[in-house]
Amino acid sequence: MILLIILLPLVGFLLCALFSRYMGRVGSAVLTTMIMFVNVILTLILFYKVSVLRRLYFINIGTWIYSDSFQVNWSFYIDNLTITMLLVVNIVSALVHLYSTDYMSHDPHLPRFMSYLSLFTFFMLMLVTGDNFVILFLGWEGVGLCSYLLISFWYTRLQANKAAIKALVVNRVADFALTIWMVSIFFVFKSLDFHVVFPLAPFLLIPRLFFLVLIYLY
């Protein structure tokens, strides 16, 4: 169910991007919106299991990068914080899909807009469910890309293009800071996995903590 929740928006994006000419504007909008509301229902079920039944979920799909002491897995972790963010992201995204279906009903490029929304949602879900900083970084990069695509959707408007470029530049600054922070965390903990870093953080030696603070301030 967890992988289904994460991947459904990506499926909506692919269907809308590849078959919109056959489904038409209305069909593409209805399909992506229905997928998001199905995702909300699945997330509510998962929310009950995590928050009420007190279950935690860890999924490791496989190893992506492996080199000596550096290893990155395609892994996802669901706890109370994660499921709360999942619920917020999916509900807000479903409502935005629904609103856009009516608000942009007369736009000939509606399928493209809906596909961007679905892709944005997929990367956001990846960001909040990933169990390591690399997956979080990939999700962040995807969110930045989709933000650019959505802001510059009406690419013939000069102001839209300027705003999109500004958003892209701001995201690149954050990328630089996040990259330095990831390198610093690996230097201290020898791992980028959340389930390794978080339990060790309270036992961090003061000099290393000071080093991380300096990196952050820089």
Language-model regions, residue ranges each:
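...captures the hydrophobic TM-helix bundle architecture rather than a specific catalytic motif
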Residues: M1-Y218
